[in-house]
């Protein structure tokens, strides 16, 4: 998922204010309601750390497993692995920066490795 908040003040870049993030994610619970409907086993958030102010993104049982920065191609990206519980089921989460077309092959490989590591 690339959009935790479904509205924006700019057609090309994320200029979502912190108050809008809090309102949409924590108060309206748009993201957590979507997750309950979709019932995923894995979630990848391409938001970087700019949405960490609304962490745990309205999800229960949120537990951080690994938080660091990782080199991807020529970039260094934020990388957060976590689990949450949705309707009694574990959900694996990865919050990472968006590759923006740079080092895409390395980025895809890292995310793929994460998915493989976390599939039961």
Please name every model-derived segment.
Residues 1-15:
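Short, surface-exposed acidic-centric catalytic microdomains
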Residues 2-3, 45-48, 96:
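Short His-Asn-centered micro-motif
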Residues 9, 48-52:
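Oxyanion-hole/transition-state-stabilizing segment in secreted/luminal serine hydrolases
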Residues 11-17, 39, 43:
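Catalytic core of non-heme Fe(II) oxygenases with the double-stranded beta-helix
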Residues 14-32, 51-120:
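C-terminal capping/extension of enzyme domains
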Residues 31-48:
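Proline-aspartate-enriched helix->loop->beta-strand connector
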């Amino acid at each position: 998922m690339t959009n935790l908040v479904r509205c924006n003040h700019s057609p090309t870049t994320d200029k979502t204010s912190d108050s809008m993030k809090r309102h949409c994610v924590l108060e309206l619970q748009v993201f957590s309601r979507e997750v309950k409907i979709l019932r995923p086993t894995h979630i990848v958030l391409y938001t970087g750390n700019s949405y960490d102010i609304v962490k745990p993104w309205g999800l229960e049982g949120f537990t951080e497993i690994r938080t660091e920065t990782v080199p991807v191609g020529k970039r260094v990206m934020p990388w957060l692995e976590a689990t949450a519980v949705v309707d009694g089921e574990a959900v694996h989460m990865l919050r990472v920066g968006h590759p923006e077309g740079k080092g895409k092959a390395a980025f895809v490989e890292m995310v793929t490795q994460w998915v493989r590591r976390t599939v039961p």
